[in-house]
Structures are given as structure tokens and as C-alpha cells.
């Protein structure tokens, strides 16, 4: 399993719901957790490894148990927002502050098919929102005006020998 990097079109795909949570899906989740940990990330969504599945994994910190989110749906967000510097494993080295709702209520299934509805706030809520965006083909840089987005991406694109806007 390998990471997919910007500007790969696989990062822009809206994922499909998972109909059967089976050993194949559990294996994907396990490998995604390993890749996320090796890469030093706190979240990883299926499109970031080239999978067209509504699946992401999260580990808020090195001491936390990894969480698997299958067919997730944010059903409520707080009216209170917070700003925090975000980055993305698929766009290494690019970081910038982004305003997001401070808390979310999310419905999902775990790797065993058990359904959960939980409320999260602060950093975990931010990670969940970031990974949910990936499942809809949205990257954190998409929230910025084109001029700022291009400025943030220019060094990244140049470093990879890609043409920047």
C-alpha cells in the first residue's frame, strides 16, 4: 500500500459506501493504520492510498488507540469554530491555518461492523473533518482563495518538478 500525492486525480474522487465489512476491508484498515503511523500522520483516508472506499483511520496521538471509520457521516457540527494549522500526508510540507467547527457528531461503523454515533471536539473533531473531506474529493487547500492556494503549493510543486500555477 502506497501513499497517493497531490495533484493525483485519485484524491478528487467521491468515494463509494462499503457494502460488506469483511476481512479485505479490515486488512485495508490495518495497512492504512501502519502507513499512517510510519508517515507520522494522525489520519489517513482511503483515497490517499488509491482506494475508492468510504473509509478512514485516525490516531489522535501516539498513545491513543487507532480508530477505524467506515461509511462515516457527520450529522451535526458546532456553531463554534476554531483555527488550527493543518497539513496533509498527501501534500507533505504544506501547512496553513484553517477554520473548522470545533465539535462534530459523527455516525460510522468500525472494522467489526458495529455502528457508533459519537461526539468529538477540538483536535479529534478537526482530524475527522479533514478525513471526511478526503472521502468527498476535497483537500484542505481547497478552502483557500486561489492566490493563497497557489502560493502555498508553489514550493511543493517545484520540489517535485511539477508545474505550479
Swiss-Prot record:
Gene Ontology BP terms: co-translational protein modification; translation
The keyword Protein biosynthesis is assigned to this record: yes
Described function: Removes the formyl group from the N-terminal Met of newly synthesized proteins. Requires at least a dipeptide for an efficient rate of reaction. N-terminal L-methionine is a prerequisite for activity but the enzyme has broad specificity at other positions.
Cofactor(s) the record lists: Fe(2+)
Catalytic activity annotation: N-terminal N-formyl-L-methionyl-[peptide] + H2O = N-terminal L-methionyl-[peptide] + formate
Gene Ontology MF term list: metal ion binding; peptide deformylase activity
Recorded family membership: Belongs to the polypeptide deformylase family.
Matching Pfam families: Pep_deformylase (PF01327)
Enzyme Commission identifier(s): 3.5.1.88
Parts forming coiled coils: none
Bound cofactor: record note: Binds 1 Fe(2+) ion.
Protein name: Peptide deformylase
InterPro entries, per the entry: Peptide_deformylase, Peptide_deformylase_sf
HAMAP family with a match to the protein in the record: Pep_deformylase
Classification via CDD domains: Pep_deformylase
Membrane listed as a keyword: no
UniProt keyword list: Hydrolase, Iron, Metal-binding, Protein biosynthesis
Stored Gene3D superfamilies: Peptide deformylase
Disulfide bonds: none
Gene designation: def
Entry binding sites for Fe cation: 88, 130, 134
NCBIfam families found in the cross-reference section: pept_deformyl, PRK00150.1-3
Record-annotated active site: 131
Amino acid at each position: 500500500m502506497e501513499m497517493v500525492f497531490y495533484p493525483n486525480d485519485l484524491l478528487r474522487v467521491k468515494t463509494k459506501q462499503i457494502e460488506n465489512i469483511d476481512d479485505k476491508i479490515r486488512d485495508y484498515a490495518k495497512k492504512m493504520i501502519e502507513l499512517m503511523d510510519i508517515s507520522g500522520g494522525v489520519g489517513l483516508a482511503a483515497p490517499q492510498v488509491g482506494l475508492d472506499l468510504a473509509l478512514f483511520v485516525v490516531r489522535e496521538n501516539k498513545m491513543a488507540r487507532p480508530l477505524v471509520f467506515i461509511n462515516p457521516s457527520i450529522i451535526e457540527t458546532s456553531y463554534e469554530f476554531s483555527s488550527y494549522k493543518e497539513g496533509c500526508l498527501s501534500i507533505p510540507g504544506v501547512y496553513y491555518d484553517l477554520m473548522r467547527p470545533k465539535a462534530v457528531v459523527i455516525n460510522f461503523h468500525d472494522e467489526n461492523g458495529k455502528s457508533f454515533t459519537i461526539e468529538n471536539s477540538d483536535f479529534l473533531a478537526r482530524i475527522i473533518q479533514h478525513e471526511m473531506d478526503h472521502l468527498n474529493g476535497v483537500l484542505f487547500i481547497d478552502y483557500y482563495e486561489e492566490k493563497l492556494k497557489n502560493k502555498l503549493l508553489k514550493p511543493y510543486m517545484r520540489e517535485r518538478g511539477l508545474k505550479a500555477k
